[in-house]
Amino acid sequence: GDVYKRQTQLRALVRASAFGRIKIMVPLVTCVDELRSVKAMVADIMKELDAEGIAYNKNLEIGIMMETPAACMMADVLAKEAAFFSIGTNDLTGYTMAVDRGNSKVAYLYSAFNPAVLRAIKRIIECGKKEGIMVGMCGEAAADPKLIPLLLAFGLDEFSVSATSVLKTRKTIADSSMAECKALADKVMAC
């Protein structure tokens, strides 16, 4: 059931890569074997397509949506095998803080500014940078003008934000001094 569905979806993505630049991002990763499994499936699909004479991008990138505390803790290992990371801040925050932001009794605990979440984000970026892979971010935090200076100081490569946040995010980035961002990050991370 699930394996067949996953193989069908992956085959469609690999075939679509012949017509434009796409990347495959594996969600909810908790261990390196999950990434290896997807990479093995894609390699098998590529062999099938070669045998069938069907075109595809032979340099298709496979990365990870970094959104679980387990992925954060394994970021150094995962970065050696992933083509890129995208930090999913909404889920990473919720899972790290063990809260459902929709639950009014604990929603006050949901914050990307929590030191545990900031440390998780910083660790993911550092591990990605060490291995030379691109690290992006999606979720509400990527567009937060108060958080952007920290993300710049940590070395985030790419901000994925909603269309309504693009201009404000670009302005915040353009107006940021890296020296000030790093000073702020040093102060915040010392807490």
Residue ranges and their predicted role:
Residues 1-4:
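Short, small-residue-biased leader/transition segments that mark boundaries at the very start
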Residues 13, 24, 67, 78, ...:
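Conserved, mostly hydrophobic/aromatic
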Residues 22-26, 62-66, 85-87, 135-139, ...:
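Hydrophobic faces of well-ordered beta-strands that scaffold small-molecule active sites
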Residues 28-35, 62-77:
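Active-site glycine- and acidic-residue-rich loops that bind
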Residues 49-61, 98-141:
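Generic long, charged, amphipathic alpha-helical segments
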Residues 70-80, 142-156:
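Catalytic cores of alpha/beta
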Residues 85-95, 150-172:
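Glycine-rich phosphate-binding active-site loops on the catalytic face of alpha/beta enzymes
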Residues 97-108, 166-188:
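C-terminal helical cap(s) of enzyme catalytic domains, especially alpha/beta-barrels
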